[in-house]
Amino acid sequence: MLLSELSHPNQLHGLTVSQLEEIACQIRERHLQVVSTSGGHLGPGLGVVELTLALYQTLDLDFDKVVWDVGHQGYPHKLITGRFSQFDSLRQQNGVAGYLKRSESKFDHFGAGHASTSISAALGMAIARDRKGDNYKCVAVIGDGALTGGMALEAINHAGHLPNTPLVVVLNDNDMSISPPVGALSSYLNKVRHSPPLQFLSDSVQESVKNIPLIGKDIPEELKNIKGSVRRLAVPKVGAVFEELGFTYMGPIDGHDIGNLINTFNAAHKLKKPVLVHVVTTKGKGYPYAEADQVGYHAQSSFDLTTGKSIPSKKPKPISYSKIFGQTLLKICEQDSKVVGITAAMATGTGLDILQKNIPDQYIDVGIAEQHAVTLAAGMSCDGLKPVVAIYSTFLQRAFDQLIHDVGIQNLPVSFVLDRAGIVGADGPTHQGQYDISYMRSIPNFVLMAPKDESELQRMLITSINHKGPTALRIPRGSGLGVAVMDEGWEPLNIGEAEILEEGNDILIIAYGSMVASALETAELLKAKNINSCIVNARFVKPLDKKLIMPLASRIQKVVTMEEGTLIGGFGSAIVELFNDNEINIPVYRIGIPDVLVDHASPDQSKEKLGLMPNQMADNIIKKFDLNN
C-alpha cells in the first residue's frame, strides 16, 4: 500500500510488519520533503513514525482516542489521517496546522501547542467514557521532556488512584525535548533507557500458586501478593516509580521495532487499568543530520536535503532580538556574578545558550516547568541574587499565579524577559504572544516595558536588573531592525519615561515596543497626505509617562495607540484608563489585536488580516478621524 492511498488510519489494520515498514519509509520521505521546503518541526516526527503506525494498528480511530502531547511529533499522524495531499501547505496560511487541531480533523482528538497536557486530557476522556458506559480506548503519547512538566506528573498521580480506569500512557523517550531534558526524572529515565525489556509476569503466576499441593484454590493472603512482589523485584528502577504511583509499567521497548511495538500495545490495552509503555526512540530517525544534531533539527527553516544546511535568505537579516538579549546578558553576567539566567527548557530559543556555554554556573534550566522557574527566581532574589527569567510570552501564561503570589505581592526584584511577544507566525494560536500586556498589567508592583529596537533592548535589560522590584520586558520574535548595539556601557532608562520621536500637530500616535517602527512608517504615509503626526515611543505600559502623554493629548486632541497585543486590557486600554481617570475627554483609536485567535500564517499575513500593516493603519486613521479634508 502507498502512503498516498491512506485516507483513514484504520486502513493500517491487517497490514504486515514489512508493509508497515514500507509505509514508514514513505512517511519519512514525505516528512523530509515538505519540511525541507517550507520549514517546520523535523526531528520529533521522524522519531515516532514506527510508534505511530504500530499504535494505530491496535486502535480503531473511529472510536478510540489518542492525545499527542505538544504536537511536535504529530506529522506522521497527520500523514496517515487523510492529509497527505494537503501536507505541502504545512504551517502556511489556510493550510495544514503545525499542531493538532480539533477543527482540522476528527482524528485530532485534542489540540495542543504547550507541553505536558496529554495525560490530563486523555484521563479526562477516559473518565467521561466510563461514566457514559462506553468502552473505547484512551491513549496519551508524551515525550520524556514533557514528562518533566508538573502538570504531567499531577495527571499521573491522579490516574494512578483510579485502578479500574483503563488508560495507556506511551512515554516517547528520545532523551531530548527541544533542548536536552534536565532534572532527576530525566536522569532516572536515562538509567533504564538501555536496560533489557521487562516482560511482565502474567496472571499465570497466580495460577501456578493455585496448583501448589495442600493450598489449591484457597490462597493465603501472603501468597496472593507474590506476583506483585516478584514483579517489583524485576521492574527497572524507573518502572518502580510508576508502579508505586499505580501504573503497570512496560518497557523499555525499541521504538523502531514495529512488530514488538504492536505486541506491547495490544498487551497494554488488555490490562484494563492505567499502563505506562516506555518506548525508546531516536529523535530525527532516518535522517543522519537530524540524528547527529537533535537540538538544531528539532525545528528547521527550509534546508538542503543533501547537505542538511539551511537555505540562506536572499537578503541578509539583522541579528535576532533573542541573540542580542543573550549576548547582552552574558556581558552583564561577566561583570556581576549575582546575575543568573533562568530558562524553562528553551535555552536556544530564548538566547540563553550562549550563557550556558560560557558561564554555566550562572545559568539554570528547570525543564518544562514555568511555574517552578518563576518561584525559584523569587526565592533566589530573596537572598541577594539577581535572576533573569527568559520565557516565551505564551509559556509564561502557565505561571500566572506565581507571578502574582510569589513575585508581585512580595515586590521581589525578578527580571522577566518575554520572548516571542506579539505575532509569531506559523506556530498559530497556541504560540501567539498576544496576551502578556493584558495579563501582566493587572499585577501590582510590576514594571512593564518593551523596546523599539535592539539598542533600547540593551538599555531596558540593565534597567530591569538594576530595578528593586519585578519587571517584565517583552521582545518580538525574529530579527531586529539592524540598529547598532554596544558591548558595554548601557545607560539605564528612567522608569516610566517615554520619548517623542517626531513632532506633529494633526495626530498623536503612541506606540509600544515593536509597533514603534510601524508607527514611523505610518507617519510617513500620512505625511504624504499632509497629515503631520506626533510619534511617541511609550517604552513603558506600566507606569505610563503621564507628564509627557497627557499634555500632548490635550493639545492635539486626536490619539492613536499601537500595540502588538490583544486590545482587551492592553496598552491602548491603559491609555484610555489614564485619560478617563484624569477626566480627559479625547477620542482614542486603539490599534492592536481584536478579540480573535490568530491562526497560523506568516507574521505579515497575520498583520495584514488584522489591519496592522502601515498602509492599512494610515488609511484607517484617516477614516477614523475624517482627515481627508
From Swiss-Prot:
Residues that hold Mg(2+) according to the record: 144, 174
SUPFAM superfamilies xrefs: Thiamin diphosphate-binding fold (THDP-binding), TK C-terminal domain-like
Biological or metabolic pathway of the protein: Metabolic intermediate biosynthesis; 1-deoxy-D-xylulose 5-phosphate biosynthesis; 1-deoxy-D-xylulose 5-phosphate from D-glyceraldehyde 3-phosphate and pyruvate: step 1/1
Catalytic activity: D-glyceraldehyde 3-phosphate + pyruvate + H(+) = 1-deoxy-D-xylulose 5-phosphate + CO2
Cofactor note: Binds 1 Mg(2+) ion per subunit. Binds 1 thiamine pyrophosphate per subunit.
GO cellular component, one term: cytosol
Residues that hold thiamine diphosphate according to the record: 72, 113-115, 145-146, 174, 287, 370
InterPro entries listed in its UniProt record: Dxylulose-5-P_synthase (IPR005477), THDP-binding (IPR029061), Transketo_C/PFOR_II (IPR009014), Transketolase-like_Pyr-bd (IPR005475), Transketolase_BS (IPR020826), Transketolase_C (IPR033248), Transketolase_CS (IPR049557)
CDD domains: TPP_DXS (cd02007), TPP_PYR_DXS_TK_like (cd07033)
Description of how the protein assembles with itself and partners: Homodimer.
PANTHER family membership: 1-D-DEOXYXYLULOSE 5-PHOSPHATE SYNTHASE-RELATED, 1-DEOXY-D-XYLULOSE-5-PHOSPHATE SYNTHASE, CHLOROPLASTIC
Family of this protein: Belongs to the transketolase family. DXPS subfamily.
Function: Catalyzes the acyloin condensation reaction between C atoms 2 and 3 of pyruvate and glyceraldehyde 3-phosphate to yield 1-deoxy-D-xylulose-5-phosphate (DXP).
Entry protein name: 1-deoxy-D-xylulose-5-phosphate synthase
Species this protein is from: Prochlorococcus marinus (strain MIT 9215)
Gene: dxs
